[in-house]
C-alpha cells in the first residue's frame, strides 16, 4: 500500500477521529479509505445515468460565494425547476435545486459545483 500525506483542518481531523471511534475503525487511514471509495462509487453511479431524469441537488456553501452559485445556476435554468435558498448558522447557505432534464446536463451541473471548490457539501439524489 502506498503512503500519502494529506493536510487537513483541525475540525475535519476531529470529525474523522470521532467517526473512527464511533464506527470502530482501526485508524484514520481506514476512515479516509472508506470515504474515498464512497466518493468514487457515487461518481461512478452518476456517470451510469442516462436519459431524462429527475433529481434534487443539495449544496451548502459560505455566504460569500452566493454570486458564484448564482452564476453557475443561470447556465442551467433549462433544467432547474425550483430553487430554495436558506441562511444557516455560521455564515453558510443551503441551496436546494429540484431538477428535471437530460442526465448528462444534470451531471454537468453537479460537476460544475464540485469543480469550483467552494462548496462545503454537495449531494445529488436522482430518481
Curated annotation (Swiss-Prot):
<dbReference type="InterPro" id="IPR002145">
    <property type="entry name" value="CopG"/>
</dbReference>
<feature type="binding site">
    <location>
        <position position="85"/>
    </location>
    <ligand>
        <name>Ni(2+)</name>
    </ligand>
</feature>
<feature type="binding site">
    <location>
        <position position="93"/>
    </location>
    <ligand>
        <name>Ni(2+)</name>
    </ligand>
</feature>
<dbReference type="InterPro" id="IPR010985">
    <property type="entry name" value="Ribbon_hlx_hlx"/>
</dbReference>
<comment type="similarity">
    <text>Belongs to the transcriptional regulatory CopG/NikR family.</text>
</comment>
<keyword id="KW-0238">DNA-binding</keyword>
<dbReference type="GO" id="GO:0010045">
    <property type="term" value="P:response to nickel cation"/>
</dbReference>
<protein>
    <recommendedName>
        <fullName>Putative nickel-responsive regulator 1</fullName>
    </recommendedName>
</protein>
<keyword id="KW-0533">Nickel</keyword>
<dbReference type="Pfam" id="PF08753">
    <property type="entry name" value="NikR_C"/>
</dbReference>
<dbReference type="GO" id="GO:0003677">
    <property type="term" value="F:DNA binding"/>
</dbReference>
<comment type="function">
    <text>Transcriptional regulator.</text>
</comment>
<dbReference type="InterPro" id="IPR050192">
    <property type="entry name" value="CopG/NikR_regulator"/>
</dbReference>
<dbReference type="InterPro" id="IPR027271">
    <property type="entry name" value="Acetolactate_synth/TF_NikR_C"/>
</dbReference>
<keyword id="KW-0805">Transcription regulation</keyword>
<dbReference type="Pfam" id="PF01402">
    <property type="entry name" value="RHH_1"/>
</dbReference>
<keyword id="KW-0804">Transcription</keyword>
<dbReference type="InterPro" id="IPR045865">
    <property type="entry name" value="ACT-like_dom_sf"/>
</dbReference>
<feature type="binding site">
    <location>
        <position position="87"/>
    </location>
    <ligand>
        <name>Ni(2+)</name>
    </ligand>
</feature>
<dbReference type="InterPro" id="IPR014864">
    <property type="entry name" value="TF_NikR_Ni-bd_C"/>
</dbReference>
<dbReference type="InterPro" id="IPR022988">
    <property type="entry name" value="Ni_resp_reg_NikR"/>
</dbReference>
<dbReference type="GO" id="GO:0003700">
    <property type="term" value="F:DNA-binding transcription factor activity"/>
</dbReference>
<keyword id="KW-0479">Metal-binding</keyword>
<dbReference type="GO" id="GO:0016151">
    <property type="term" value="F:nickel cation binding"/>
</dbReference>
<dbReference type="InterPro" id="IPR013321">
    <property type="entry name" value="Arc_rbn_hlx_hlx"/>
</dbReference>
<feature type="binding site">
    <location>
        <position position="74"/>
    </location>
    <ligand>
        <name>Ni(2+)</name>
    </ligand>
</feature>
Amino acid at each position: 500500500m502506498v503512503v500519502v500525506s494529506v493536510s487537513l483542518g483541525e475540525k475535519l481531523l476531529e470529525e474523522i477521529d470521532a467517526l473512527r471511534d464511533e464506527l470502530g475503525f482501526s485508524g484514520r487511514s481506514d476512515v479516509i479509505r472508506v470515504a474515498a471509495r464512497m466518493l468514487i462509487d457515487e461518481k461512478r453511479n452518476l456517470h451510469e445515468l442516462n436519459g431524462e431524469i429527475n433529481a434534487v441537488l443539495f449544496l451548502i456553501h459560505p455566504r460569500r460565494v452566493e454570486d458564484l452559485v448564482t452564476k453557475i445556476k443561470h447556465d442551467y435554468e433549462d433544467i432547474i425547476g425550483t430553487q430554495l435558498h436558506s441562511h444557516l448558522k455560521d455564515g453558510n447557505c443551503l441551496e436546494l435545486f429540484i431538477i428535471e432534464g437530460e442526465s448528462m446536463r444534470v451531471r454537468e451541473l453537479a460537476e460544475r459545483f464540485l469543480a469550483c471548490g467552494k462548496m462545503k457539501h454537495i449531494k445529488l439524489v436522482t430518481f
